[in-house]
Design a protein with these regions (language model features):
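P-loop NTP-binding core
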Residues: 1-273
Length: 273
């Protein structure tokens, strides 16, 4: 089983970050729907919203205005993860919500680092998540569309990374920069970090371009590319505005089936079916 263990040898949940500094590639949609689909298969899942925009938070049914404490409070040391986690209305799925305050956390962490040379600004999230990870089978992190300190904290805390890639022209643009960031994290901060997989998103079967992009990405990443391809669908785009994952919003849709298939692949790759 490809899972981390604590000092007692007990299996702890796998932490997977969804990362791509390009916006609009289906990162948050995948974070929400992969989390919900894993939960549907009986996995205990914590969805961690690290994007200050908070779309993963609203996408599982919470109003940003009602959030009293968020992952920001975990970062600044005023709360533990267990104080902030919210139970969603979906079985086996919990949320660590985001807030707009998170937008300034990079600067706050840098300032703390200047004031205290022993302050480890890249390890704040890892140390906090390690305290709760044995309560979950998976912790899925929705990263912001940037490679700043928030994302660095996510990569340092994670066992692996899923890169969502849109099936469109310039799909691989910025991928080299992202892979360099992952390699740098491996070298300096988290030698155990691995590439979990590459997910093709927003595929339009009506265009030849989409098929060309799939071939290009498969030749580049080989077996790391998931068999599952996420289609471009109106129902998938609508679901977050209703505060529901696609498997709750439209269970019989192609989008719902695609994310259930992806969850199955993730479970199989990690040997915890």
């Amino acid at each position: 089983m490809n899972m981390s263990k604590n000092e007692k040898g007990e299996i702890m949940g796998k932490i997977i970050s969804l990362v791509n500094q390009k916006g609009g590639v289906g990162k948050t949609t995948t974070s929400i729907n992969l989390s919900a689909s894993l939960a549907m298969y009986g996995q205990r899942v914590l969805l961690l919203d690290l994007d200050p925009q908070g779309n993963a938070t609203t996408g599982v049914g919470f109003n940003k205005g009602d959030i009293e404490r968020s992952v920001y409070d975990v970062f600044n040391g005023t709360a533990e993860v267990s104080d902030v986690v919210l139970r969603t209305k979906f079985k086996n799925l919990s949320l660590l919500p985001s807030s707009l305050q998170l937008a300034g956390i990079d600067i706050e962490l840098l300032e703390k680092g200047r004031e205290n040379p022993t302050f480890q600004k890249a390890f704040q999230l890892r140390d906090k998540l390690n305290m709760v990870r044995e309560n979950y089978d998976y912790i899925i992190i929705d990263c912001p569309p940037s490679l700043g300190l928030i994302t660095t904290n996510a990569l340092t805390a994670s066992d692996s990374v899923i890169i969502p890639v849109q099936c469109e022209f310039f799909a691989l643009e910025g991928i080299t920069q992202l892979l360099n960031a992952i390699m740098l994290t491996q070298k300096k901060l988290n030698p155990e970090l691995k590439l979990e997989g590459v997910l093709l998103t927003m595929f339009d079967s009506k265009t030849n371009l989409g098929i060309e992009v799939i071939e290009e990405i498969r030749s580049y990443f080989k077996e790391k590319v998931y068999t599952t391809i996420i289609p471009r669908l109106i129902r998938l785009a609508e679901a977050p505005s209703h505060g529901k994952p696609i498997i709750a919003y439209d269970p019989k849709s192609k989008g719902s089936q695609a994310y259930l298939n992806l969850a199955k692949e993730v479970i199989e790759r990690n040997g915890n079916a």
